[in-house]
């Protein structure tokens, strides 16, 4: 867990003399202990090694056979688990979050459970009901992390839709909503009404079993959103595979009809938009305008995106157009355009529009802070920033020190639950891990500074 060396005092707002570019040179690393920095450097270097990411699950099984569960588990807890996971128990999570708060960072809890799109469907509803229980407990934990609890500050947590409904159903809905006339049968308003009433919609494209599963899925989503709203916790819905996006967007829109209305006090259900997809800018603009016309609050988590290798492979297999941007630069340009669109929207609509700039890219973060100052957007959380726990701390700490609202995405749970989740995330975010070279350099420089006081390491 984190060990704080100094308590960080953050500013109340942007610089009074004009915008000043933030420095992401690792200067804020003085807030962390030498042991933390050493572990971070070693783990990030390990995770940047492609064979470890590609064969992570196999290597984990091999280490358990060779070392035994006890030694293997101890090694993981001291390395990867300790770097990226808050802990297993509520007390461990609270301890991690308390340390983050001394660094002016806030928690964004994530339940590490999901269903892979190509996996066999789970039998019955029991698996999804179990996940519902985990989500409700996450709501409780998210709310309990505020000390003392305050209605002035809402907690945030991540929500994975395919933990509550099957990917097979999502694929059926995704193919159906693209057809002419489907908008009447599967409108967000009709789904929202079914969530409230519990009625079976009898959607014509689904068989009886699928319709029953849809009914149960809508009920689960409604129960999570209803409980989260009562506990003052905002839900950030995770992005998933492109093949599921139309269904996920439909379900999020249905939740928004109910929970993002003006009387509810801002967006309680947010959607995630991936800049790596070619259609994201147009879809984001369309959704923002639709929410504004309907009088609904609009919450967005903007990410560069994941799943790139699999998205391209699936498109090639089925002879479809690649839905992803052609290269890193195109993705960066897409992110910049989406960021500008949303910041302008926030400036115009104030508390009815919230944005999380979820990026490890220094230039994207600088663009956001500069435009916030130019547009007069206050540092009250309508625009916040997000990075993964255990990564990009040189950016997170600098933002927190400057007074911006910063969240760290925090998975928690047992080794058995979290390690497979982390390996999948690593496989989906190879570019992020391999692109963390600058952070490794900054960590190395800080460690050299501590080990050899007064000496400067000559860069290679």
UniProtKB/Swiss-Prot annotation:
Group of enzyme by EC: oxidoreductase
Family matches, as InterPro entries: FAD-linked_oxidoreductase-like, Proline_DH_dom, Proline_oxidase
Keywords in alphabetical order: Acetylation, FAD, Flavoprotein, Oxidoreductase, Proline metabolism
Top-level lineage group: Eukaryota
Modification type N6-acetyllysine: residues: 310
GO biological process: proline catabolic process; proline catabolic process to glutamate
Enzyme Commission number, as recorded: 1.5.5.3, 1.5.5.2
Gene Ontology cellular component list: mitochondrial inner membrane; mitochondrion
Regulation: Hydroproxyproline dehydrogenase activity is inhibited by THFA,(1R,3R)3-OH-cyclopentane-COOH and 5-OH-1H-pyrazole-3-COOH.
Gene Ontology terms for molecular function: FAD binding; oxidoreductase activity, acting on the CH-NH group of donors; proline dehydrogenase activity
Catalytic activity field: trans-4-hydroxy-L-proline + a quinone = (3R,5S)-1-pyrroline-3-hydroxy-5-carboxylate + a quinol + H(+); L-proline + a quinone = (S)-1-pyrroline-5-carboxylate + a quinol + H(+)
Presence of keyword Zinc-finger: no
Cofactor: FAD
Function summary: Dehydrogenase that converts trans-4-L-hydroxyproline to delta-1-pyrroline-3-hydroxy-5-carboxylate (Hyp) using ubiquinone-10 as the terminal electron acceptor. Can also use proline as a substrate but with a very much lower efficiency. Does not react with other diastereomers of Hyp: trans-4-D-hydroxyproline and cis-4-L-hydroxyproline. Ubiquininone analogs such as menadione, duroquinone and ubiquinone-1 react more efficiently than oxygen as the terminal electron acceptor during catalysis.
Family of the protein in this entry: Belongs to the proline oxidase family.
Protein name: Hydroxyproline dehydrogenase
Lineage of origin: Eukaryota, Metazoa, Chordata, Craniata, Vertebrata
């Amino acid at each position: 867990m984190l060990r704080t060396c100094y308590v960080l005092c953050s500013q109340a707002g942007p610089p009074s003399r004009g915008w000043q570019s933030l420095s992401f040179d690792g200067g804020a690393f003085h807030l962390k202990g030498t042991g933390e920095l050493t572990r971070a450097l070693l783990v990030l270097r390990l995770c940047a090694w492609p064979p470890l990411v590609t064969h992570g699950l196999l290597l984990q099984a091999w280490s358990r056979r060779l070392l035994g569960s006890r030694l293997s588990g101890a090694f993981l807890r001291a390395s990867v688990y300790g770097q990226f996971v808050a802990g297993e128990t509520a007390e461990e999570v609270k301890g991690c979050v308390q340390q983050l708060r001394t660094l002016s960072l806030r928690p964004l809890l994530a339940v590490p459970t999901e269903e892979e799109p190509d996996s066999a469907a789970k039998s019955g509803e029991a698996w999804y009901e179990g996940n519902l229980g985990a989500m409700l407990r996450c709501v409780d934990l998210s709310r309990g992390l505020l000390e003392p609890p305050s209605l002035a500050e809402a907690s945030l947590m991540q929500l994975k839709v395919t933990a509550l409904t099957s990917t097979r159903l999502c694929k059926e809905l995704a193919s159906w909503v693209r057809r002419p006339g489907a908008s009447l049968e599967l409108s967000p308003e009709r789904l929202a009404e079914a969530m409230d009433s519990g009625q079976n919609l009898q959607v014509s494209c689904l068989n009886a079993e699928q319709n029953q599963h849809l009914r149960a899925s809508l009920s689960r989503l409604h129960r999570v959103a209803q409980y989260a709203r009562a506990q003052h916790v905002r839900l950030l819905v995770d992005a998933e595979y492109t093949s599921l996006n139309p269904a996920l967007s439909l379900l999020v829109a249905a939740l928004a009809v109910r929970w993002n209305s003006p009387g509810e006090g801002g967006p309680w259900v947010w959607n995630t938009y991936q800049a790596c997809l070619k259609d994201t800018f147009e879809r984001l603009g369309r959704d923002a305008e639709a929410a504004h016309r309907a009088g609904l609050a609009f919450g967005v988590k903007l990410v560069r995106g994941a799943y790139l290798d699999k998205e391209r492979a699936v498109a090639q297999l089925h002879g479809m157009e690649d839905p992803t941007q052609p290269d890193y630069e195109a993705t960066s340009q897409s992110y910049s355009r989406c960021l500008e669109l949303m910041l302008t929207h926030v400036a115009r609509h104030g508390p009815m529009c919230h944005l999380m700039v979820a990026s490890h890219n220094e230039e994207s973060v600088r663009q956001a802070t500069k435009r916030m100052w130019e547009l007069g957007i206050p540092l009250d959380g309508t625009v916040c920033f997000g990075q993964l726990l255990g990564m990009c701390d040189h950016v997170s700490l600098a933002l927190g020190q400057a007074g911006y609202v910063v969240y760290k995405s925090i998975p928690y749970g047992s080794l058995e639950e979290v390690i497979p989740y982390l390996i999948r995330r690593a496989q989906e975010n190879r570019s992020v891990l391999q692109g963390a070279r600058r952070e490794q350099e900054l960590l190395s420089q800080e460690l050299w500074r501590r080990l050899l006081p007064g000496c400067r390491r000559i860069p290679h």
